[in-house]
Every structure is written in structure tokens, then in C-alpha cells.
Amino acid sequence: MLKFTGNCLIVPWDFSEMALAALKTSVAMVDDRAKIKVIHVGQIPTSTEPTVIWDTITEQSIQEYASKSFQKTVADHPELSGLELVTLFGDPGFAITDYAQEIAAELIVISSHGRRGLSRLFMGSVAERVVRLAQVPVLVLRGPAD
């Protein structure tokens, strides 16, 4: 396993098994877990017609849900202890790369879900966008193809 000798790396967190693999890989790459910044990018749903459900989804509720879910994951995987989650909002590609620049991160470790064909066309690829936008190296961990 390669060792990361820089000061800071970012791991985007989307609650998936692949994101968990990226976290575990990052932990194995560093000597000091404080170098790892785990981020989740939340998006508030938009609708042309406001409804009751949209009123209950706020940045605070997204942040609380992400924090609780991440804490549960850390509790289930002791090797991740000491990691903390930062929640950002906006377009995931821009939010991840802007935050990397803001905190002078030297590496982004991101998972890719392995989408192909129409699934990739319609859902896009955050990992691909991060690779295109990032000013720092990006390590992409590929998942199995759908």
C-alpha cells in the first residue's frame, strides 16, 4: 500500500460500500488520521411546486442525518475511529474540488460506482467530474460494473 506523506487528503462520503472502501484505503495510507477530511455533499431537493416534504428537508436536517449515519458507520468499523465528517452543500463535483482548494488538500480519494451506458449517462459520474475539476491528484477506486 502506498503511504500518503502530505498534510491533508479528502474522502467524499455518500453512504455507499464503495465510499467505505475509500475510507478504509485512506486510513491505510496515512500515519495520522487527522490528515483525513471526510466530506459529504448534501443537496436540498428542488421542486417547481413546493410541497410539505420539501419544507421538512433543510440543510440542518441533511447535516444531522449525514452525521448520525457516519457515526453509525464509524461505530460499526472501529478502524475508522477518530474520523469526523464535514457536510457541504451544492453541486458535488464543485463542492469537493472547491473544498480541496480551500483547505489546501493534496489528494482526493474517491470511489466510483462503476456505472456504464445509460445509467452513467443519466446519473452522471461525480468521480469523473472531480477528476476533471480538481487542481490536485485524485485517486479513484473503481467499483464493479453494473
Label for each model-derived stretch:
Residues 65, 87-91, 113:
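Short beta->alpha linker loops
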Residues 30-31, 78, 135:
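Short conserved AdoMet
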Residues 37-39, 83-88, 139:
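General small-molecule cofactor/ligand-binding pocket signal
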Residues 1-4, 75-108, 146:
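Structural beta-alpha unit
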Residues 55-68:
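A short acidic, glycine-rich active-site loop
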Residues 2-52:
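Small/aliphatic-rich secondary-structure junction motif
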